[in-house]
Amino acid sequence: XGESWETPETGDEVE
């Protein structure tokens, strides 16, 4: 898959 979500720590977009 390839879901992009923001990390609760920095808010960076991670795939």
From Swiss-Prot:
It catalyses: [protein]-peptidylproline (omega=180) = [protein]-peptidylproline (omega=0). One of its GO terms (molecular function) is calmodulin binding. It comes from Pinus pinaster (Maritime pine). On the 2D-gel the determined pI of this protein is: 5.3, its MW is: 72 kDa. PPIases accelerate the folding of proteins during protein synthesis. This PPIase probably binds calmodulin. Its EC number is 5.2.1.8. Keywords: Calmodulin-binding, Isomerase, Repeat, Rotamase. Signal peptide: none annotated. This is 70 kDa peptidyl-prolyl isomerase.
